[in-house]
Curated annotation (Swiss-Prot):
GO terms for cellular component: cytoplasm. The keyword Protease does not apply. It comes from Bordetella avium (strain 197N). It catalyses: NAD(+) + ATP = ADP + NADP(+) + H(+). This is NAD kinase. NCBIfam families: PRK02155.1. GO terms for biological process: NAD metabolic process; NADP biosynthetic process. Its EC number is 2.7.1.23. Involved in the regulation of the intracellular balance of NAD and NADP, and is a key enzyme in the biosynthesis of NADP. Catalyzes specifically the phosphorylation on 2'-hydroxyl of the adenosine moiety of NAD to yield NADP. The keyword Cell membrane does not apply. It is found in: Cytoplasm.
């Protein structure tokens, strides 16, 4: 039997999840699977009929996690479950949904195909970022999308010295710097004019945010190296910069802090129904292949 124990995880404080979660749980039970409900999801919904499990318990016992929400929900769950190797499938109950690629209305059909063995598993790399103050480790966290260094809300530009494996790359003045995985190349990095990276690439991309020099451009580097960014100037206020991990956890930065970023030891395992295509997702989400329409209206 494929995936005998299935965990259901919903977006935090989403008030519209009760009915679709119950329907999925009933469908899974009818298919002979044991259903667990994430503890936070159970607290935030009225779905109390099934065994409740913490994220750690899900990691230790579940064979599949079904995540209902947006991409942000999947990011958080993926970081928690990656060390356990539990695969997850995303049901889109958010907006854009690059990672939660299954529409809510198709959830039952897609899950039925997966339970029947018609699925593929995709390994997605994570980043591990650490903040150092002298020799002291101040903060460390993983990220599926990106690690972002940026100026504080009241601060000006920040300046950082960037090295790869101890080799000097450049010094940059900008509002920020995005270090993104292939998964993250469709997120914040894309809005900052970064390139799209195929998820099969073993690479990460550095994308400047509003750089002072117009010659600054994104650069793709191998995922085997260790990036080292030293904060050499901050703008106008003492706590003028911060490091963000998937924009969900963060650390304040001080002048002279050093931030290291490298590939994390674990991967996120994403389950897709057989026939999934990254390019199909791009076409749908970015509206490729839609030709301009001729209009007689004066704009």
């Amino acid at each position: 039997m494929h995936f005998p124990i299935v965990a259901l995880i919903g977006r935090y404080q989403d008030t519209g999840l009760d009915a679709p979660l119950r329907a999925l749980a009933a469908m899974l039970t009818q298919a002979g699977r044991r259903v667990l409900v994430d503890a936070d999801t159970a607290r935030n919904t009225a779905v109390h009929e099934y065994p409740v499990a913490t994220m750690q318990e899900i990691g230790e016992s579940a064979s599949l996690a079904v995540v209902m929400g947006g991409d942000g929900t999947v990011l958080g769950v993926a970081r928690h479950l990656a060390p356990y190797g539990v695969p997850l499938i995303g049901i889109n109950h958010g907006r854009l949904g690059f990672i939660t690629d299954i529409p809510l209305q198709d959830a039952h059909d897609a899950l039925a195909r997966v339970l029947d063995g018609n699925f593929q598993i995709e390994e997605r790399m994570l980043l591990q970022g650490s903040v150092w103050r002298g020799d002291a480790l101040m903060y460390t966290a993983s990220a599926l999308n990106d690690v972002v260094l940026n100026r504080a809300g009241r601060g000006g530009m920040i300046e950082m010295r960037v090295e790869l494996d101890g080799v000097y790359m450049y010094t940059q003045r900008a509002d920020g710097l995005i270090i993104a995985t292939p998964t993250g190349s469709t997120a914040y990095a894309l809005s900052a004019n970064g390139p799209l990276l195929h998820p099969g690439l073993n690479a990460m991309v550095l994308v400047p945010v509003a750089p002072q020099s117009l010659s600054n451009r994104p650069i793709v580097i191998p995922d085997t190296g260790v990036l080292n960014m030293t904060l050499t100037a901050i703008g106008r206020v003492e706590t003028g910069a911060s490091a963000h991990f998937d924009m969900q956890t963060w650390s304040d930065l001080q002048l002279g802090d050093r931030i290291t970023v490298q590939r994390a030891p674990h991967t996120a395992r994403l389950v897709h129904p057989q026939g999934y295509s990254f390019f199909s997702t791009l076409r749908r989400k970015l509206h490729w292949n839609q030709m301009p329409q001729v209009s007689d209206n004066i704009e």
